[in-house]
């Protein structure tokens, strides 16, 4: 199996305050993982570290990280409110070779095509989350990390998210979901990391 992230002593925190201590973790391409735990248990911190977006203290942890395409949909929106949806797509996919027809088809699938010229700042929280999921679908990274995947999504949005997860499983791409409890999104799961323990 091919690893994209591994540590035998992952310790994370902010300044001198520990959030995660001595976690042994190894993550493989083409596998699914879930991170669960109560508020404050370190779920967001861990998913940010895995996706290389963590700006806290690693306390000399031994971390192996393979250079790969990885995307994080965090608990806070990452899209730029002063840009339109289409401008955000072009910004986040600037290195990708994706044609306009593909973009239009994906936006249509997520019921966003008629909003592509609208500013993200005018979107509801649910529309912003669906837009981020649509961008993840277009980008199709080898590893997709989603923190609190169901937050802001209505029933249709949850279905669209689950369809994307299923598609990624069939394509052999890794997905990591982080929430207070399992959301049952995966048909097969390599490891569930419970940070309450």
Regions from the language model: what does each represent?
Residues 50-94, 196:
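ABC ATPase nucleotide-binding domain signature region
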Residues 100-116:
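Conserved ABC ATPase "signature" region
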Residues 5-7, 20-22:
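Conserved structural motif at the start of ABC-family nucleotide-binding domains
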Residues 133:
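Hydrophobic anchor residue at the start of the ABC signature
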Residues 119-126:
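Conserved ABC ATPase signature
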Residues 36-38:
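The feature captures the beta-strand-to-loop junction immediately N-terminal to the Walker
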Residues 144-148, 153:
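Catalytic Walker B motif of ABC-type/P-loop ATPase nucleotide-binding domains
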């Amino acid at each position: 199996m091919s690893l994209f992230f591994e540590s035998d002593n992952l310790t994370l925190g902010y300044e001198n305050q520990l959030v995660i201590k001595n976690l042994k973790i190894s993550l493989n391409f083409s596998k699914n993982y879930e991170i669960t735990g109560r508020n404050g248990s370190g779920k967001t911190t861990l998913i940010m570290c895995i996706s290389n977006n963590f700006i806290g203290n690693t306390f000399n942890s031994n971390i192996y990280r393979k250079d790969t395409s990885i995307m994080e949909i965090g608990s806070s929106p990452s899209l730029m409110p002063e840009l339109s949806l289409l401008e955000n797509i072009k910004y986040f996919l600037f290195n990708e070779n994706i044609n306009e027809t593909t973009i239009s088809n994906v936006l249509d699938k997520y019921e966003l095509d008629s909003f592509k010229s609208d500013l993200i700042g005018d979107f509801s929280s649910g529309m912003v989350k669906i837009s981020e999921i649509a961008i993840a679908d277009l980008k199709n990274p080898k590893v997709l990390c989603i923190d609190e995947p169901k937050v802001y999504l209505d029933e249709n949005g949850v279905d669209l998210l689950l369809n994307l997860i299923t598609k990624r499983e069939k394509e052999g791409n890794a997905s990591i979901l982080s929430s207070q409890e399992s959301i049952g999104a995966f048909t097969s799961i390599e490891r569930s990391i419970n940070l309450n323990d």
